[in-house]
Amino acid sequence: EGGKGPFTVATAHLSFVPGYNVRQLRALRRWLHGLPRPLVLLGDFNLPGRIPARVTSFVELVHEPTYPVMRPRVQLDHVLADGLTASEQATAEAAVHLLPVSDHAAVSVDLDL
C-alpha cells in the first residue's frame, strides 16, 4: 500500500522462446485482469522494445536497453503499468543500473503511489 492507497505489483520471467513468451504474457494479462489498480507488472520478458506494452495495452515506464549488461543494446526487461493517472505516469522516474550481478541490467522506477 502506498500513500494514496493499495496497488498491485506482479513480476514475471518469461520464456526466451519466440512466440511462447508472447503467449505467456497474454495469459498473464488475463490473470491480472481482475486485480486492483493501479498495477505494475515488471520483469525479464525476453521481448524487445514495445512488444510487451502492445500485447498488454499497459504503459511502458522504462525506455532503455537492458541487455547485455556490459553494453546494453536491446530492452528485454520491462516495467509496465496499468491504471496510473497521467500525473503518476509523468512523474515516474526510471533508471537502468549496470550491475555485475546478471547478464541483464537492473531496472528501477520510482512511483508516487
Residue ranges: model-predicted function:
Residues 1-113:
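Active-site regions of metal-assisted phosphoester/phosphodiester hydrolases
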